Structure formats: C-alpha cells, structure tokens
UniProtKB/Swiss-Prot annotation:
Catalyzes the phosphorolysis of diverse nucleosides, yielding D-ribose 1-phosphate and the respective free bases. Can use uridine, adenosine, guanosine, cytidine, thymidine, inosine and xanthosine as substrates. Also catalyzes the reverse reactions. It holds the Pfam family Ppnp. It comes from Salmonella schwarzengrund (strain CVM19633). This is Pyrimidine/purine nucleoside phosphorylase. It comes from the Bacteria. It catalyses: a purine D-ribonucleoside + phosphate = a purine nucleobase + alpha-D-ribose 1-phosphate; adenosine + phosphate = alpha-D-ribose 1-phosphate + adenine; cytidine + phosphate = cytosine + alpha-D-ribose 1-phosphate; guanosine + phosphate = alpha-D-ribose 1-phosphate + guanine.
Length: 94
C-alpha cells in the first residue's frame, strides 16, 4: 500500500511503500529550501537527481551528495539539509 506524506508546507513530498527488494522505504522530492528532519530509526538516503547539502549528527562540516550518492543517518537523531534545486531521493528505513 502507498502512503503519501507532505512536510514543510508542501515543499517536501514523499510516497512510502514496502517491497521485497528495498524493504520499507519512501521516494520523494524536495523543493529549494533548508530543512531539519528527525529519525526514529536508522535511514539510508540515496540522492536520485539533484543534490543535497547535508549536515549529519556529530559532524561540523556540510557535505554535498549528488545523484547516485548515499549517506546514512543514525536512528533517534536529526540531520539538516540545504537544497538548491528540486531534488529527488530514496529513503530506506534500516
């Protein structure tokens, strides 16, 4: 079953799903802006198109991830994003 989600007044939208190949995941698009997300469980984020500038928990330097690149976020934490262009992503819940 598909589950639609909307965050930050519609600037981030995602569709959650479960499949045998990826497990529980969501795909989405972020409009330009700055966002902070909290995690309940570990997440693996893959940038599909565009780019995300990311500040991960426990780090002091921002890092840019572009299409095809992956980063991991620990559970029970938060991470910060800067988005300069519409960017799509795949989020797997680990």
């Amino acid at each position: 079953m598909l589950q639609s989600n909307e965050y930050f007044s519609g600037k981030v939208k995602s569709i959650g799903f479960t499949s045998s190949s990826t497990g529980r995941a969501s795909v989405g698009v972020m409009a330009e802006g700055e966002y902070t997300f909290g995690t309940a469980e570990p997440e693996e984020m893959t940038v599909v198109s565009g780019a995300l500038k990311v500040l991960l928990p426990g780090t002091v330097e921002w890092k840019v991830y572009t299409a095809g690149e992956v980063f991991n976020v620990p559970g029970h934490s938060e991470f910060h994003l800067q988005v300069a262009e519409p960017t799509s992503y795949l989020c797997r819940y680990l």
